Amino acid sequence: MSIVARKEKQKQEIRSLILEESMKLFVEEGFSKVSVRKIAERVQYSPTTLYLYFKDKNEILFYCCESGFEKMLEHNIALGLISDPIERLHQMGVNYLNFGLENPEYYDLMFIQEAPMAALIEMGAGWSSGDQALEALKMIVQDAMDKGLLVPAK
């Protein structure tokens, strides 16, 4: 392995460690009670080192949630193989519940705590994988409506 490749691998490992431990802290203590200094203590790096990887605590939160949505999307890859939109919708619900049970930290950060939305607004950003998850749901519902299996409320 070349020096450049080894350094890049080390950089990704540190970044992953920061995200993993930050997520645990956000869930344990709440986003507002966690500081970059506290995250740095947890990962045993200086706060300055964390700023080499992330702009601020909000950016750390953003990438924690983005990672969660990516994991959630992985649960839904096989949905396209189900032709019946009602069955697809049902399976998406099952996948959502299983995701929450298998990944309680991600679930709490993504859907329970208010901090992610505030961080998104402050950053002026959006979650591409979160948007994809919502779009998949909308497409299933629209397919069911197109086939007359779901009727809009009047």
Which residues does each predicted region cover?
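Short coil/turn segments at alpha/beta junctions that flank glycine-rich nucleotide-binding fingerprints
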Residues: 28-32, 103, 147
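Hydrophobic alpha-helical connector segments
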Residues: 63, 77-106
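Hydrophobic/aromatic residues within well-ordered alpha-helical segments
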Residues: 14, 57, 64, 68, ...
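Helix-turn-helix
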Residues: 17, 21, 25-59, 63
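N-terminal intrinsically disordered/low-complexity leader segments
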Residues: 1-13, 24
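Amphipathic alpha-helical segments used for helix-helix packing
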Residues: 102-121
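Amphipathic alpha-helical packing segments from all-alpha helical-bundle domains
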Residues: 77, 121-147
